[in-house]
């Protein structure tokens, strides 16, 4: 399963009742009901699913506001290319 598919699955588990499969990758997730509590739950699920640690300064909808943002963050952490904030 690719990163985006896994993120969409995790959104389904943590982001509330919404059709996450059909949300465009660049759409603001807040528009679709994502809130800060869902965001923290999602980040915890991502850390467990991908075996990564999201830096505290990257927690929040500013950095994981779209599916594309989330996938990019995961890739950067996995590749060791996450730039300091």
Q: Which sequence ranges carry the predicted segments?
A:
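Phosphopantetheine-dependent thiolation modules in NRPS/PKS and related acyl-activating systems
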Residues: 1-44, 48-85
